[in-house]
């Protein structure tokens, strides 16, 4: 009877113990730690993704064998109990990760990828607000110019140009919303921001038609050009997930402020001459 009891206790210590956990991750995670703790002494530790080996560590020879598809994988600690797996995002694949040793003890972790927004909700809202206000001010500038001068070919070009800019940016806004990181949303953001350079051309046309070209106008144009440069730099830094869009917002905000100054200058300051085109 005692011999049977000892056998049962021995078998119990060697029985396969499987604990399944679910870990959620996003593209914002640079590295991911997959937990595993093995209390029993072992000769080797093996991590698998489904049926494919990721990492095998031989505790006797202290050597590690890595899969060529998971070169960033490493053990969190080489202690007897903590054998958690650390792996970089570029090597992570959703699926079931299994930790085992020569005694058959296992810990199973299921990784689930969650999709996240390209920018946070606050930054996305500000992008739409800045773009919308800029287009509204552009509409007011063109309207004021149209009612202040006699219609001409140059005025017609200004009106068509303004309509094209507005259509491109509005289409970009529809493609960009919601701000997920996909090809469609990248194209949408580019359409929302890059046409801002043409606002400088419409500004020059408006001031030229109203004969209000002066040093102050040059300062406004340079200010808007600086905003466009900030926007382009912000775009370059934002072409990946989970980024801070502060620089991009600074550029869009600068462009919006320059449009305010332009409209104010058009309305409040007299032209340098009385003849209109």
UniProtKB/Swiss-Prot annotation:
GO terms for molecular function: thrombospondin receptor activity. It comes from the Viruses. The chain crosses the membrane at residues 124-144, 156-176, 186-206, 219-239, 247-267. One of its GO terms (biological process) is positive regulation of cell-cell adhesion. Keywords: Glycoprotein, Host membrane, Membrane, Transmembrane, Transmembrane helix. Its main location: host cell. InterPro entries: CD47, CD47-like_TM, CD47_Vset, Ig-like_fold. The keyword Aminoacyl-tRNA synthetase does not apply. GO terms for cellular component: extracellular exosome; host cell membrane; plasma membrane. It is a multi-pass membrane protein. Pfam families: CD47, V-set_CD47. It is found in: Host membrane. Glycans are attached at residues 29, 58. Belongs to the orthopoxvirus OPG166 protein family. Promotes, when overexpressed, the influx of extracellular Ca(2+), leading to membrane permeability and host cell necrosis. This is Protein OPG166.
């Amino acid at each position: 009877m005692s011999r049977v009891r000892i056998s049962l206790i021995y078998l119990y210590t060697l029985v396969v113990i499987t604990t399944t956990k679910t870990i959620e991750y996003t593209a914002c995670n640079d590295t991911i730690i997959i937990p595993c703790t093995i209390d029993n002494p072992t000769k080797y530790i093996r991590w698998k993704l489904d049926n494919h080996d990721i990492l095998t560590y031989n505790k006797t020879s202290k050597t590690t064998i890595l899969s060529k598809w998971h070169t960033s994988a490493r053990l969190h600690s080489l202690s007897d109990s903590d054998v958690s797996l650390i792996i970089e995002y570029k090597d992570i694949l959703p699926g079931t990760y299994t930790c085992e040793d020569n005694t058959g003890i296992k810990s199973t972790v299921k990784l689930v990828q969650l999709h996240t927004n390209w920018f946070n909700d606050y930054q996305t809202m500000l992008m739409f607000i800045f773009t919308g206000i800029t287009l509204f001010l552009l509409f007011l500038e063109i309207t004021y110019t149209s009612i202040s001068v006699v219609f001409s070919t140059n005025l017609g070009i200004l009106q068509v140009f303004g309509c094209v800019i507005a259509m491109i940016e509005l289409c970009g806004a529809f493609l960009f919303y919601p701000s997920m990181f996909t090809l469609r949303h990248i194209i949408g953001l580019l359409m929302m921001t890059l046409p801002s350079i043409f606002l400088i051309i419409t500004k020059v046309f408006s001031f030229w038609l109203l004969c209000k070209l002066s040093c102050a106008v040059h300062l406004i144009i340079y200010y808007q050009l600086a905003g466009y440069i900030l926007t382009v730099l912000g775009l370059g830094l934002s072409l990946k997930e989970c980024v801070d869009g502060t620089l991009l917002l600074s550029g869009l905000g600068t462009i919006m402020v320059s449009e305010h100054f332009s409209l104010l200058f058009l309305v409040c300051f007299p032209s340098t001459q009385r003849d209109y085109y």
